[in-house]
């Protein structure tokens, strides 16, 4: 499913190139230009000359009895010159231990344009909260990251289904618990393996 991120005034501008960004081989794009991505593993279009992508890598590594699922911390990747369609490749890692070493420093992502040239980028590891599940509430963490650096986006997601109404519809009180459950399930899926283990331990301690 494609998601289009566009500048607020894109309908008035004719010189902005819509670039397709495709994650490859276990790369998940969680946020793009401050907006959460609905389908982290799917290609998306960005209507901007630059892009900030919050990504993480998840894959089953190793072989046989040594196979483990690796989930990286989120990284903030900034592409200053987005002039063509690109593919985002993860670092070349083949074991859980190798991946741990690679993602403890500055992982070597590869961003390749359709022209075949490598696209330059900068990156930072997203700073999480203290304690277990440090990346719970990732939207707030990204907002803080950008605020500290003076980064502001005028981009927004244009979805296929657009519903307009003249009045705000108040949610019934009975839906609050369901909403909380959905949100918890969402962040559990986004959490790394270690974060999930810590969360399950915390749940047992509450009983």
Swiss-Prot record:
Belongs to the UPF0319 family. InterPro entries: UPF0319. Residues 1-18 form the signal peptide. Transmembrane segments: none annotated. Keywords: Signal. It comes from Vibrio vulnificus (strain YJ016). This is UPF0319 protein VV2327. It comes from the Bacteria.
């Amino acid at each position: 499913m494609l998601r289009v991120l566009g500048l607020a005034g894109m309908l008035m501008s004719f010189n902005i190139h819509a670039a397709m960004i495709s994650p490859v081989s276990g790369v998940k794009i969680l946020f793009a230009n401050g907006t959460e991505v609905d389908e982290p593993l799917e290609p998306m279009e960005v209507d901007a000359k630059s892009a900030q992508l919050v990504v993480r890598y998840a894959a089953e590594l190793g072989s046989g009895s040594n196979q483990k699922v690796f989930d990286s911390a989120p990284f903030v990747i900034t592409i200053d010159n987005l002039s063509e369609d690109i593919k985002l490749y993860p670092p070349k890692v083949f074991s859980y231990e190798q991946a741990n070493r690679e993602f403890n420093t500055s992982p070597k992502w590869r961003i390749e344009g359709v022209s075949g040239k490598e696209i330059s980028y900068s990156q930072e590891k997203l700073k999480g909260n203290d304690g277990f599940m440090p990346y719970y509430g990732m939207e707030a963490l990204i907002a803080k990251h950008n605020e500290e650096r003076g980064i502001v986006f005028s981009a927004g997601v244009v979805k296929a289904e657009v519903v307009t109404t003249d009045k705000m519809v108040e949610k019934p009180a009975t839906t609050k618990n369901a909403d909380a459950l959905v949100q918890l399930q969402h962040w559990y899926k986004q959490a790394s393996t270690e974060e999930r283990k810590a969360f399950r331990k915390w749940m047992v301690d509450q009983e």
